[in-house]
Amino acid sequence: MAEIKPAEISAILKKQVEGFESGATLEEVGSVLQVGDGIARIYGLSNVQYGELVEFDNGLEGIVLNLEEDNVGVVLLGASTGIKEGSTAKRTQRIASLKVGEQMVGRVVNTLGFPIDGKGPIGGDLYEMPLERKAPGVIFRQPVTEPLQTGIKAVDAMIPVGRGQRELVIGDRQTGKSTVCIDTILNQKEFYDAGKPVFCIYVAIGQKASTVAGIAKMLEEKGAMAYTVIVAANASDPAPMQVYAPMAGAAIGEYFRDSGRPALIVYDDLSKQAVAYREVSLLLRRPPGREAYPGDVFYLHSRLLERACKVIADDDIAKNMNDLPDSLKSIVKGGGSLTALPIIETQAGDVSAYIPTNVISITDGQIFLDGDLFNSGVRPAINVGISVSRVGGNAQIKSMKKVAGTLKLDQAQFRELEAFAKFGSDLDAVTLNVIEKGKRNVEILKQGLNSPYTVEDQVAIIYAGSKNLLKNVPVNKVREFEKDFIEYLNNKHRDTLDALKAGKLDDKITDVIEATAKELSAKYN
């Protein structure tokens, strides 16, 4: 029989007692009173904070948005299946966040940052970024001075966008709003290829899954997914996911911005976000205001769009930025930027409705797309009279600024005279000249789908148009002339185009452009 050694047994017991950990932890738990339509009312979470995440017994999370006397209103970040009256919900003592990293580029993710493109989990170093975050304070910003080239002639010439600007794209449905923004993303390939990428985030809110899949496929084919992230909250997703999708996109953009790099974010579109927010607010029984939107819908958009800015170039100041997530503190650099292109859909061109006026007043200008222009074949259908860029002019390259200086005025004058000319046929030579030049400029500013232009090509053709060098070219042949003109300059005078790209515009350059235009327009005589 084996001998029992008391000393050995007591040593083992001592060791086990030392390693014993109490499994009991203090958790604040509440119970679900009511659930439905993506909203749960919970009793018992008396110390919960506004905006805090709560976790249900099936693992689903929700955000606390209403704090009432005897219960809290929680919006669910997912389907409510599995949650019923009496289910438990516990505090997590953290706010909604997502994990962002370099390997998120090229992926399609949902509002919570989880991939939905079937390409497996996102690897590499990931940094936790809060969905909601205070915008950088005044001392952490600097004025917009660098251009963000959209590749769209009408925009880069007349409504220029700078890095760190918020430029609204507004218009009726089917007027090419998304196309303007997607072309801008495609145009950043030039900078990616040159090793100076502008990281792009496309946020699709309340769109059909097939539409988002089509956009992802097109960006992939054009090589643009190499620097783009798509955040998708589809039409079938719960309203809270659609409300928070733009915040998720902004958090991804802030990761690039705060690490000293330029980023561009497209919100497509904020009208659908406002509708989803209205739905959530009404279900939470908040009092409705104008058009049944809640009173804080302005604040919803302003706090989102203020997160886009140009960060001060001084690293030491940038490191002290307000509300900086702890995870980012080791990689913060100054000089980054986040440019926002929010999209708003109008009803029958009414820009004086509630949401359009709100967003117009928040942003630094707007690109207004006109249904009538679109239907008459002017694409992109930009209404130059109503469109404006409040800060982008400082960011234009010098050559473009010189060339496009009078273009906006010329086109506004042309539209006025064109309307006047419909009433009478007897026009003097000066008026006829303005109308003929205007018609050719309209043709020059037309552009095909997904075909952005480099800035030097834009400057060259706009110079030719503004100096009336195309007067001998029939209006219906202007697009053909433009193609030949740009091809000729690229083949024979690449040095001239490089000088234009660098911002130069002297007599030597203008002589080359004028001689080329004269030579090529001769065949139309």
From Swiss-Prot:
Keywords: ATP synthesis, ATP-binding, Cell inner membrane, Cell membrane, CF(1), Hydrogen ion transport, Ion transport, Membrane, Nucleotide-binding, Translocase, Transport. The keyword Translocase applies. Transmembrane segments: none annotated. It catalyses: ATP + H2O + 4 H(+)(in) = ADP + phosphate + 5 H(+)(out). Its EC number is 7.1.2.2. The keyword DNA-binding does not apply. The record marks 387 as: Required for activity. It is an enzyme of class 7 (translocase). It is found in: Cell inner membrane. ATP binds at residues 171-178. GO terms for molecular function: ADP binding; ATP binding; proton-transporting ATP synthase activity, rotational mechanism. CDD domains: ATP-synt_F1_alpha_C, ATP-synt_F1_alpha_N, F1-ATPase_alpha_CD. It is a peripheral membrane protein. InterPro entries: ATP_synth_asu-like_sf (IPR023366), ATP_synth_asu_C (IPR000793), ATP_synth_asu_C_sf (IPR038376), ATP_synth_F1_a_nt-bd_dom (IPR033732), ATP_synth_F1_asu (IPR005294), ATPase_a/bsu_AS (IPR020003), ATPase_F1/V1/A1_a/bsu_N (IPR004100), ATPase_F1/V1/A1_a/bsu_N_sf (IPR036121). It comes from the Bacteria. Its main location: membrane. Pfam families: ATP-synt_ab (PF00006), ATP-synt_ab_C (PF00306), ATP-synt_ab_N (PF02874). One of its GO terms (cellular component) is proton-transporting ATP synthase complex. F-type ATPases have 2 components, CF(1) - the catalytic core - and CF(0) - the membrane proton channel. CF(1) has five subunits: alpha(3), beta(3), gamma(1), delta(1), epsilon(1). CF(0) has three main subunits: a(1), b(2) and c(9-12). The alpha and beta chains form an alternating ring which encloses part of the gamma chain. CF(1) is attached to CF(0) by a central stalk formed by the gamma and epsilon chains, while a peripheral stalk is formed by the delta and b chains. HAMAP family: ATP_synth_alpha_bact (MF_01346). Produces ATP from ADP in the presence of a proton gradient across the membrane. The alpha chain is a regulatory subunit. Belongs to the ATPase alpha/beta chains family. This is ATP synthase subunit alpha.
